[in-house]
Amino acid sequence: MDQDNNNHNDSNRLHPPDIHPNLGPQLWLNSSGDFDDNNNNNNNNNNNNSTRPQMPSRTRETATSERNASEVRDATLNNIFRFDSIQRETLLPTNNGQPLNQNFSLTFQPQQQTNALNGIDINTVNTNLMNGVNVQIDQLNRLLPNLPEEERKQIHEFKLIVGKKIQEFLVVIEKRRKKILNEIELDNLKLKELRIDNSPQAISYLHKLQRMRLRALETENMEIRNLRLKILTIIEEYKKSLYAYCHSKLRGQQVENPTDNFIIWINSIDTTESSDLKEGLQDLSRYSRQFINNVLSNPSNQNICTSVTRRSPVFALNMLPSEILHLILDKLNQKYDIVKFLTVSKLWAEIIVKILYYRPHINKKSQLDLFLRTMKLTSEETVFNYRLMIKRLNFSFVGDYMHDTELNYFVGCKNLERLTLVFCKHITSVPISAVLRGCKFLQSVDITGIRDVSDDVFDTLATYCPRVQGFYVPQARNVTFDSLRNFIVHSPMLKRIKITANNNMNDELVELLANKCPLLVEVDITLSPNVTDSSLLKLLTRLVQLREFRITHNTNITDNLFQELSKVVDDMPSLRLIDLSGCENITDKTIESIVNLAPKLRNVFLGKCSRITDASLFQLSKLGKNLQTVHFGHCFNITDNGVRALFHSCTRIQYVDFACCTNLTNRTLYELADLPKLKRIGLVKCTQMTDEGLLNMVSLRGRNDTLERVHLSYCSNLTIYPIYELLMSCPRLSHLSLTAVPSFLRPDITMYCRPAPSDFSENQRQIFCVFSGKGVHKLRHYLVNLTSPAFGPHVDVNDVLTKYIRSKNLIFNGETLEDALRRIITDLNQDSAAIIAATGLNQINGLNNDFLFQNINFERIDEVFSWYLNTFDGIRMSSEEVNSLLLQVNKTFCEDPFSDVDDDQDYVVAPGVNREINSEMCHIVRKFHELNDHIDDFEVNVASLVRVQFQFTGFLLHEMTQTYMQMIELNRQICLVQKTVQESGNIDYQKGLLIWRLLFIDKFIMVVQKYKLSTVVLRLYLKDNITLLTRQRELLIAHQRSAWNNNNDNDANRNANNIVNIVSDAGANDTSNNETNNGNDDNETENPNFWRQFGNRMQISPDQMRNLQMGLRNQNMVRNNNNNTIDESMPDTAIDSQMDEASGTPDEDML
């Protein structure tokens, strides 16, 4: 019965075919349907009586004979295709000749059951069907004796095609039947092999198997029955059409034989697909009736078949429910595409308008103006009430253009679910309250950036918005305690809350929040100084689903909070983010408790927690791959060791910020190379970062890096070349902060940076240097042209310095590099004082002038370490004794004293000496490696410097002087230890010190050579730049002086001779002079008056002189690529700039 019902339902869902006479019904015969035989026969008889035309009356006998023949024909046709004789009982599987019932026998007879399924002979069915078709067609030929022979051949062809199609249907049924039989047979064999006839499980399986067989037979029976009905319908419709055709022929009308159309219809049937039956049969009957009616009503001799109209197709989408249609239209990517469909129908218009106004797309002022033009109208003036369709409003991108007036137009949006007013600084609380009034479906409100937030917003939410789930209101200073309490009490569904900078937020409200809002997953109550550990303990205990927790700049928070929490709850599995920035009283104990409670923590913000040490980083390393963001700005006690442990364990970190962590060195940059998913680096004011560390990090991370934002402001030791390599390795880089990095404060580079925020002071504007967006791409392109080509940051530093010397043609033919260096050094030593003085280094603010360059004796740099010139006379050691003492030396410490060792522990570096002397030598080893690192950094910086001309060298000169003084101090300490050992007269002490000298003499000599070569290149670079800068200074003076002289000469000529008419406008003269100078620089020197002007002194302002000397930009000369002055009053850019800098460094506002 289930199969019958399914077939019946399927037949009712069939689609109408195409009934054009020349095309035929498409796929109307290819589905299974269940029809009642009696109803079908009655319908056919009714159709025959009502639509069949009467034969023209010739004689009563002829009419009677034809009527009798028709009755005989109908009876014969019904008998031929009647399968009622095939009884259901004869088709069911039997057991010993008896039909099976629900009480199956325990005797298992699989073969007998399978044979019962083969009771239907498909060949017999095919023969019966074809016999019926043949008889029916033969009767047609007898009843229509006047048909020409050609048309009789068409009838015969139609019969053959019908028979072929019947055979195809039966083959499909037979294949399906055999497939089912084979599957059942396999199951029978499996059961037979098991031999568990008495098993209840086997009996249960047999019951299921028999039901499957019965279902298969029912399905097969229904398929054959449906096929009979389909063939019957074809024959009936063909008969009616052929009768009508014959009557038309008798009347003398020219009509088309319908046999061809029926042949096309039969050939178009696909027996392998399932299509509509019921509607297809109805369309076929409609065609027959229309054909006959046209024959009776149109006696003229025209082609009747051409007047049969095609049934207008039904648009499929119109049959879908409105909800489904809404989902389909909403899937279009571009919303403006669906605007074209507004005129399809009223239903479509309503759905499309709802989609368009559900979340209006407002990203720029033009879109806002267009949207407001509609919202200014009342609901009576518009076709639809658009306010009721709006559910989400976001004005974050047009915040500067939103005021109270514009927001008031949205009052009445009763179905509003989300309202976002981020950075809408001109809006007050009154229109916000008006918009929210009556919004009972409201879920989220974000008014970040609203300066004036009062009680009415909180009261409105408490009264009209019981479903609110998210409320973000930073800087809620003016909200009273009562309003806060009222809002919390009436917001039981609250999940996300952000109320900051409110002194009324105290322990009572926090506890109320824990009791009334148990669904909270995000809590942000930063800058709430009256909240203490006790209330937060209750809050964290109740909120088991908490994911994000922020409580910053609160000195009341101590280690007791999370230590007590560990005693109350076992864990906080949902916690993903914690922000305790500015909570200065927490220590490493808090971090340990947090890690134990929240093992899946992803984001940790501990900026300005000054008591945090490396121990916290060791604890955070337990989070492993879960950790993604770490912020340790102003955590001064963090060192490279803690960073190394953190990065080695947490390799999926994406964002790091160590701003103002002054103890971090280049080793931290090396460790950053182990983070393959790193996107953001914050190292603002990490003054120990140098070119060497940055180049190594870029080299280790490789090309196509994932970095997107890099903050290196106040890293004053960086030069242009490592930044160039960083840009070339990071194609995704969109933000680069280099504020107060002297090498980048030059007009040709700062022209690509963003304008400084409007609230910055003049000094802050001078050092501001931030590149973002297109500025980063322009900077990369400019540095490509500015920097000497290199094959990545792996180029040997010594090779770079040597090539620079060769590029200046300072090595003569046949002269070795050593000889050339000695000659160059001799020449430079004579000019060093003048070169260094010309840099104007003493004018640099903040530079320590105690390290005077006059103290550097460049002529005797090779003798800076005089300790190894001192010899120990009379001390002799055999090779066995030397090897024995060498075995006692801790060579690991000598090679790297800063590896994972205790700095306070002393290792053997001078075997045989006492503990005090060995401790002194350990200290000297550490100092030597610090010196070596400084010289390596200095060497890399100089190598980077020579790649780009006119870089700021003041800090390199300072580094050079400082390194020289370190060398002097280290030499003094070594000489003092040697003197003490020699005066002691202890042979063992002297032998131990000789072993140390044996290990380190070559290292010290190598250090001196690196320093010497770097100082030579640096001085050559300064000399070359000073020469060019002097030339530029002369050209500037000449240009200004020439313009002044030209104006005087022009005035004199006009007054005296009035011969030449020269433009008197000063700006025009300047432009003319500029164009002339740009066209040919030599024209200026060819002017007789050019050299005369150098005889006069011309005043240059200090700013101009500083620009010429140091490459600093002039604030009045900042230009963009199109030589247009940058507008520094752009509010969006200024706000964005200030936000980026502030987000990168908590104290960036103290520029």
Curated annotation (Swiss-Prot):
Pathway info: Protein modification; protein ubiquitination
Superkingdom, taxonomy of origin: Eukaryota
LRR repeat feature ranges: 399-423, 424-449, 450-475, 476-501, 502-527, 528-553, 554-582, 583-608, 609-634, 635-660, 661-685, 686-714, 715-740
One biological process term in Gene Ontology: cellular response to oxidative stress
Keyword list, A-Z: Carbohydrate metabolism, Glucose metabolism, Leucine-rich repeat, Membrane, Phosphoprotein, Repeat, Ubl conjugation pathway
An example Gene Ontology CC term for this record: membrane
Bias (Basic and acidic residues) ranges: 1-18, 58-72
Function: Substrate recognition component of a SCF (SKP1-CUL1-F-box protein) E3 ubiquitin-protein ligase complex which mediates the ubiquitination and subsequent proteasomal degradation of target proteins. Recognizes and directs ubiquitination of phosphorylated CLN1, CLN2 and GIC2. Probably constitutes the primary response element required for the generation or interpretation of the signal that induces glucose repression.
Protein name per its UniProtKB record: SCF E3 ubiquitin ligase complex F-box protein GRR1
